[in-house]
């Protein structure tokens, strides 16, 4: 039951975070960010947000820095939009799955040549 609720809250957070990051964050360091996944612990205390960023490595690091500075604002926005007793503590991480998928696709394409 706790896992089902955590999954529902993660999906709701993913939707709300996408809107918050695209419309509310005015930091120029935060560029084109896509929320790819959100994992919430069973006790709803921690939320790990996976993001992908369009740009080079410096742009990714700047975006992560901008998001970490705006973490309090983002958490309060989530708290206002989703009715929870306590809003989960948010951490941002890069989603490496897209890059790994592209790398594997390139390798497979090279093998077929």
From Swiss-Prot:
Q: Which GO terms describe its molecular function?
A: ribosomal small subunit binding
Which biological process annotations from GO are given for this protein? maturation of SSU-rRNA
Q: Name one GO cellular component term.
A: cytosol
- Which InterPro entries does the record associate with it? KH_dom-like_a/b (IPR015946), RbfA (IPR000238), RbfA_dom_sf (IPR023799), Ribosome-bd_factorA_CS (IPR020053)
Q: What is the lineage of its organism?
A: Bacteria, Bacillati, Bacillota, Bacilli, Bacillales
Q: How does it assemble?
A: Monomer. Binds 30S ribosomal subunits, but not 50S ribosomal subunits or 70S ribosomes.
Job description of the protein: One of several proteins that assist in the late maturation steps of the functional core of the 30S ribosomal subunit. Associates with free 30S ribosomal subunits (but not with 30S subunits that are part of 70S ribosomes or polysomes). Required for efficient processing of 16S rRNA. May interact with the 5'-terminal helix region of 16S rRNA.
Query: What subcellular locations does the record give?
Result: Cytoplasm
Arranged from A to Z, the UniProt key words for this protein are: Cytoplasm, Ribosome biogenesis
Per the UniProt record, the source organism is: Oceanobacillus iheyensis (strain DSM 14371 / CIP 107618 / JCM 11309 / KCTC 3954 / HTE831)
What does UniProt give as the signal peptide span?
none
Question: Could you tell me what this protein is called?
Answer: Ribosome-binding factor A
Q: Which Gene3D superfamilies match?
A: 3.30.300.20
Keyword check for Cytoplasm, yes or no: yes
Instruction: Tell me the SUPFAM superfamilies matching this sequence.
Output: Ribosome-binding factor A, RbfA (SSF89919)
Q: Which PROSITE patterns match?
A: RBFA (PS01319)
Q: Name the family the entry cites.
A: Belongs to the RbfA family.
- Per the record, the coiled-coil ranges are none
Keyword Cytoplasm belongs to the record: yes
